[in-house]
Design a protein with these regions (language model features):
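Processing junctions and N-termini across compartments
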Residues: 1-2, 142
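Iron-sulfur cluster-binding cysteine motifs and their immediate structural context
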Residues: 2-19
Length: 234
């Protein structure tokens, strides 16, 4: 959320900026470049700025297209729901969600090793999206746009490297629209909806567990063991 950077009175915390490398790629690279927007993008640029307007804006910047990462959140929700329904068969068993949060996963790996068996074996929607794009378009470059600085570190994890080439925050994207004089409100719509409400809900606090719970109920409405969720606010 960058609150630590903004609050640092000594000005010793700096954020990595990827605008210039992305602009250079858009200008020089002769292959496809895809923008992948996080579920939280909805409403970030004003109540009247739709996904269709954003898709038009990305194409004007030079991107081949815009993909909603929420569709990969949908896929991973289904995967986690299937794992939950298979593995959780009593009240004392539990599963940890939020595979999409690199800091959450890093904390478990570094401080709570005993909980690793309770973490689904899923990558984040960002990584899943990048890998899918590159499987379909091997020469493609991928640029993820989202609210979280930690995504910049996640893309460079040894077991994840290569899926996403660059990460921009929403502020970086605003700056990019500003310097290129792109007025989102005046753009025409380019509509191509990708995701369901479950995938989009990943943007909200507790949204992942709610999406998994709802999907488990849809997959197995006769399930005997009740699902109870607990939220851990960081």
């Amino acid at each position: 959320c960058q609150a630590c950077v903004d609050a640092c009175q000594l000005d010793t915390l700096k954020t990595r900026k990827d605008i210039i490398p992305v602009v250079q790629e858009l200008h020089d690279y002769d292959g496809p470049i895809y923008a992948m927007v996080a579920p939280a993008v909805s409403g970030q640029f004003g109540p009247d700025i739709t996904m269709g307007k954003l898709r038009t804006a990305f194409k004007r910047l030079g991107f081949t297209g815009m993909l909603e990462v929420a569709v990969f959140a949908d896929i991973l929700t289904l995967k986690e729901a299937l794992e939950f329904d298979k593995n959780i068969n009593s009240e004392d068993q539990f599963q940890l969600t939020s595979c999409c949060c690199p800091m959450w996963i890093a904390m478990i790996k570094k401080l709570y090793h005993q909980l690793l068996p309770n973490v689904p074996g899923s990558v984040s929607p960002m990584i899943a999206g990048g890998r899918t794009v590159k499987a379909l378009h091997p020469k493609a470059k991928t640029v993820f746009i989202g609210p979280c600085l930690a995504k910049k570190a996640e893309r460079k994890e040894p077991d994840l490297v290569g899926a996403v080439d660059y990460v921009l925050t929403y502020q970086e994207l605003r700056d990019l629209f500003s310097v290129t004089n792109i007025d989102l409100a005046s753009l025409p719509e380019d509509n191509l909806p990708h995701a369901s409400e479950a995938g989009i809900s990943y943007a909200y606090a507790g949204g992942v567990s709610e999406a998994v719970t709802e999907t488990v109920h849809q997959l197995n409405p006769d399930r005997q063991v009740d699902i109870k969720t607990r939220k851990a606010d960081g």
